Amino acid sequence: MQHTINFSAAINQSTVNGLISNCLSAINQGASELVIHMSSPGGDLVSGFTAYHFLKSLPVQVHTHNLSNVESVANIIFLAGSKRTGTTGCRFLFHPFHWGLMGTSVDHTRVSEWSASLDNDLERYIDILESETDGLKSREDWKKIISSATIATATTAVEWGLMSAAENAKMPLAPGTYWWIMG
């Protein structure tokens, strides 16, 4: 049975815990397929990588669908789907990673650690992009796309291998089980 999870939230520890909880509850209730309708402005990198690896570990088919905007670290959560689609008006935003450091006092070692962490996160992010899109773009292409704050439309997303098709979301009337994560 298909279960549909509606994820319309920023990526953070709380919303990813909600996603994990809903996925496990759906599987415990007999779900053989999870459809995740997504719209997210992105958010916390650690939470995004956690969600990606969690979804890839599930013993059921995961279909991700971009309802509107999938941005920043939400891109890799979207790429965890074994089937990936999006509405004709959807978009994907790629941009350089950043951390907010307002009011924080740190030493040189901590700044170096943060810089190394951001560099490593970028490499992991590009590893996922390359793997999930079957290498349709090179590492250098992905780095340019990210560094230039690029928006990919539905058509571009299909060309780049981010999704297989642009189509409207489908909500089965019955039987169906629905879950929500909102932020």
Language-model features, listed with the residues they occupy:
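N-terminal organellar transit peptides
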Residues: 1-73, 79-183
